[in-house]
Amino acid sequence: MSIREKFIIPKRYNSIAIALMVIGLLAIIGLYVTHGAKKEVHEQARFWAALLHNSVYFLLVVNAAMFFISATTLAWGGWQMSFRRVTEAISACVPVIGTICGVILLLICFSPDHVLYHWTDSKVVAADEILKWKSGFLNKTFFAGWTIFTILAWSLLGWKMRKMSRSLDDKPLESKEAGKRYIWNNTVWAAIYIVVFALTVMSSIPWLWLISIDAHWYSTMYSWYTFASSFVAGMALIALFIIYLKNSGYLEYTNEEHLHDVGKFMFAFSIFWTYLWFSQYMLIWYSNQPEETTYFKPRAQGPYSGIFWLMFIINFIAPILILMRRGSKRNYATMTFMALLIIFGHWLDFYQMVFPGPMTDHATGETHVPMILYDFAVAMGFVGL
């Protein structure tokens, strides 16, 4: 039997993708003219925060696809093989979005105005004991080096695993011994990727790229929280592609059982995200330490409170009410709706991770700017990629 796997993107979708990228590029230009080119630091921060928010979010989401491949490979999860090309195709976006994200991060890090990362200003560090103590980790050299290493590692390891997988198309396994060697090599590279993933996404990268915007604040749950947010959005993206391809007549060996399992991941990690969301908030609220509560004050009680509580409804209430039922996880329309909702909900999550820090006047406690259409337009550009 043969599987109809070769998918040629219809011209109309190429046109839509190009249109979305043009919209994103025009939005970046417009945002630069209206905010980035101004002298006020908070106006410049508005521009760079929009780029950081979208580039980091979409990079971590597409990178979650390769984590899913590696984790299921190590767990001997053969059920995902029928749609593995889908997850591989999503992970193939990592080099492109990673390059864009890396350039944005390095420009922010070495910006002479220190618009997002105040720890890059040597004068600020010299006058701040907390930043002095963290300077061994929060410094430009380590930030740049680890960022470049991380994006290269994700890209190269993903390329290696995709290359091994595609080799089966050109040269099928001829013997049982060849099959054993392939499984062994695939398992080894998956294990290497998981180790790199643990050292980056599950620890250092959220600290460097996101939490260092509020450099005084700290949370031992933050990296896991960031991982949960990006991974559940990544599973939602996988679900969207599976549903689209099934409706187009592809993935003949992928059935509602597979979609059900993907839906279980979406449901389970929505609960896991909520556990981390609540635990982080509850422990900081209970301890009432000024260094910790300053992070949540503008988010839970200030101008960002609407987004803060809305994402709780989208990312927890909706999944637990809709995806708990077995039938919902097997219904294409319901899964499509929930996948889109989850991707948007965690886009909001990353928005409130990035914006309140640089956009809050710490002297008055007021925010400088609300969410605007430019934010959605920039996101559309990354969707087009």
Descriptions of predicted regions:
Residues 48-54, 83-85, 215-226, 363-377:
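Non-cytosolic membrane-interface motifs at loop->transmembrane helix junctions
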Residues 31-50, 71-80, 169-170:
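Membrane-interface helix-loop junction between the first two transmembrane segments
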Residues 55-172, 190-194:
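Transmembrane-helix bundle segments that line or gate the permeation/cavity pathway
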